[in-house]
Amino acid sequence: MLTLIAILAISYLVGAIPTGIMAGKMLKGIDIRQFGSGNAGGTNAFRVLGWKAGLAVTLLDILKGIVAAVSIVAFFRHHPVGAFPDINEVALRLLAGMSAVIGHVFTVFAGFKGGKGVSTAAGMLIGIAPVSMLIVIGIFLLTVYVSRYVSVASILAAIAFPLIIAIRKYIFELGGGLDYYVKLFGERFSFHDSLDYHLMIFGLIVALAILYTHRANIRRLLSGTENRIKFGRHS
C-alpha cells in the first residue's frame, strides 16, 4: 500500500510542475493564465509565447506523463516501500499517469489552476501504447495543420485513441499487444505496445474528460470565436 501511495504522490508532484507558467515567467515575466485562453498548458503557450516556447512546453508536459507511467513505476518496482501492489501492470501505469494528469490540471505549485491535461495524458499513453499513440499523434498534427485549431485536434485525438485500440485488438486480432525491439547507439532496446482492455476503458473516460475540459473551447467553436494558431507569428 505504501508503494502505491508513493507512486501516486510522486507522479502527482511530477505532473504538477507548472511548465507553461514557468516558461511565461522566464521568457516574458508574465503569468500566461492572464492572457489568451487563460490556460497554463501548451496550447496557450503557443498563443502567448510563440511556437518555440509552445513546443517546448508541450514536449515537457508530454515528458511528465511518460515519466509517471514508465520511470516512476519501474523505479518502485525495483525499490518498493514494502510490498509492491498486486495490480495489473497496465492499470498501475494508468493510475500513475492519471495522478500526473491530475497534478497538471490541479497543480499545487500554482493555486491548483494548471493546464487541461492533454499533453500529459498523451505522454502517459505514449509510455504504455506507443504505436497506437503514434497514429493518434498523426491525427492530431494533421488536424492542427488543416484547421489551425489545437482544441479540435485534441478532441479528435482523444476520441480516436480508444477506437484505435479496439480496432487493433479485435479487428486485427493483436491480442494484448506486441513487443518491439530497436537498436540505438549499438544497444538493443525493447518496449511493449499494450492493447490491454484497461486502455479502451480508460480511453473512453479520457475522451469524456477532454470534452469536459474543452467545453469553453467548444462554445467558442460553435460561436466562431475560437482562436486559431498561426505558425511563425512569434519567435
Curated annotation (Swiss-Prot):
GO cellular component, one term: plasma membrane
Alphabetical GO biological process terms: phospholipid biosynthetic process
Catalytic activity line of the entry: an acyl phosphate + sn-glycerol 3-phosphate = a 1-acyl-sn-glycero-3-phosphate + phosphate
Transmembrane residue ranges: 4-24, 56-76, 94-114, 122-142, 152-172, 191-211
One Pfam family linked to the record: G3P_acyltransf
Signal peptide: none
Membrane topology: Multi-pass membrane protein
Enzyme Commission number, as recorded: 2.3.1.275
Principal cellular location given in the protein's record: membrane
Database matches in InterPro entries: G3P_acylTferase_PlsY
Stored PANTHER family: GLYCEROL-3-PHOSPHATE ACYLTRANSFERASE-RELATED, INNER MEMBRANE PROTEIN YGIH
Function according to Swiss-Prot or TrEMBL: Catalyzes the transfer of an acyl group from acyl-phosphate (acyl-PO(4)) to glycerol-3-phosphate (G3P) to form lysophosphatidic acid (LPA). This enzyme utilizes acyl-phosphate as fatty acyl donor, but not acyl-CoA or acyl-ACP.
Protein name: Glycerol-3-phosphate acyltransferase
